[in-house]
A protein has these predicted regions:
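N-terminal interaction/assembly modules
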Residues: 1-85
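Short, locally clustered residues in the helix-turn-helix/winged-helix DNA-binding domain
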Residues: 84, 98-99, 133
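A short pre-motif secondary-structure segment
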Residues: 93-94
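Helix-turn-helix DNA-binding module
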Residues: 100-117
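DNA major-groove recognition helices of helix-turn-helix
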Residues: 121-135
Length: 136
């Protein structure tokens, strides 16, 4: 099941490039969280919010870090909101699948014991990528 895209007859069909873009966007979530932590550690940008940040080109490093943090948080929020919309109460499993690359077999065996069957899991994943691409 790994790497399968929905067929052209599916209501969640995306062309190959768009599907790959949505998959790679979702896989970047953990890296964006790590980058936010490093940006917060190296500057005082944690105290900035979107209303206080100036978008001038001559801003200092703290302002640039704050702008980057705000941008990354908005990307993470898009992914998280899409997961909560489509997951049907299985947020943790879908997050592991789309953000960490876990397969159906990995989620049904071992310590995770996901309660979804293969078809339902695939449909939720395809719906997630379809919805995420239209949010990006």
């Amino acid at each position: 099941m790994r790497g399968r895209r929905p067929s052209e007859k599916s209501k969640y069909y995306l062309p190959p490039r768009q599907y790959c873009y949505a998959v790679s966007y979702a896989l970047m979530r953990d890296e964006w969280e790590a980058e936010i932590k490093s940006l917060e550690n190296q500057s005082r940008a944690i105290r900035y919010d979107i209303d206080k940040v100036q978008t001038s080109l001559s801003g200092d490093i703290t302002e640039k870090a704050a702008i980057e943090i705000i941008d990354l948080r908005s990307k993470i929020e898009k992914i998280d909101s899409t997961i909560s919309e489509v997951s049907e109460g299985q947020d943790n499993y879908i997050k592991l699948a789309v953000c960490n690359g876990f397969t159906f077999t990995q989620l049904t065996s071992g310590r995770y014991r996901m309660p979804l069957n293969c078809n339902k899991f695939g449909m939720i994943k395809h719906r997630f990528y379809f919805e995420l691409f239209h949010k990006i």
